[in-house]
Amino acid sequence: HIRSFNSNGMVAIKDKEVMPMDVDRVIETARAMPIPADQEILHILTQEFIIDDQDSIREPIGMSGFRLEVKVHIVTGAVSAAQNIVKCVRRCGIEVNDLVLQPLASSYAVLSEDEKELGVCLVDIGGGTTDIAVWTQGAIRHTSVIPIAGDQITNDIAMALRTPTREAEDIKCRYGCALSQLADAEEFL
C-alpha cells in the first residue's frame, strides 16, 4: 500500500532572490502529479534545488536567479491503511502527530550523515516486509517496501525441511546467514 516516485518542479523567482514562498511554490509544482484517489501523500522529501542550471543546492533561500527548480521524492500510502493506523493508536489514548514511512524512520535512527552523503542502501528485513531506502548526496533517492521478509523465509524453510514453523524459525535464527563469506563452508542447509 506504499508507493514512491521522484518528481520535479520549476517556477520563476519573483524578486530575483529566492524567498521562502518561492520554495513553497516550487515544491507545490513538484507535487502536482496525478495520485490515485485511494492514495495520500505521506512525504515530500527534497533532494536538491537548482537555480538557473546551478544544481546540488540544498538551501536556496537568499540566493539570486531567475528560475528555481526542485527535485523531490514523493511517498504515498493507502488512505484506508493510514486511517486505520491512526484510529488504532488513538484508541490506545495516544495522539498521532504524523505518519512516517518505516525505511525513512530507520534511516534517521541508524544512518550517519556521512553515510547518507557518500551513498548508502538501508535494507531492513522485518517479519512481514523488507524495507529499502537509498541515499546519495545527503538526499533520499528511492524507497520501497517489499512484502517478502523473515516470515516468508521461515515458511520456506518449514516447507523445504517439512518441519514445524517454530523449528524452522529456530533454524533460521541459529544457522541463517545473509553474507556468504560469513557462512561455514563445511555446513550445508
Please tell me what each predicted stretch does.
Residues 143-145:
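Residue-level detector of high-confidence beta-strand sites
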Residues 127:
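Short, glycine/acidic-enriched loop or turn micro-motifs at the edges of active sites
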Residues 136-137, 147:
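A short beta-strand motif that forms part of the nucleic acid-binding face
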Residues 1-122, 139-141, 150, 161-189:
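Nucleotide/phosphate-binding catalytic cleft detector across ATP-hydrolyzing
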Residues 131-134:
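Short beta-strand scaffold segments in enzyme catalytic cores
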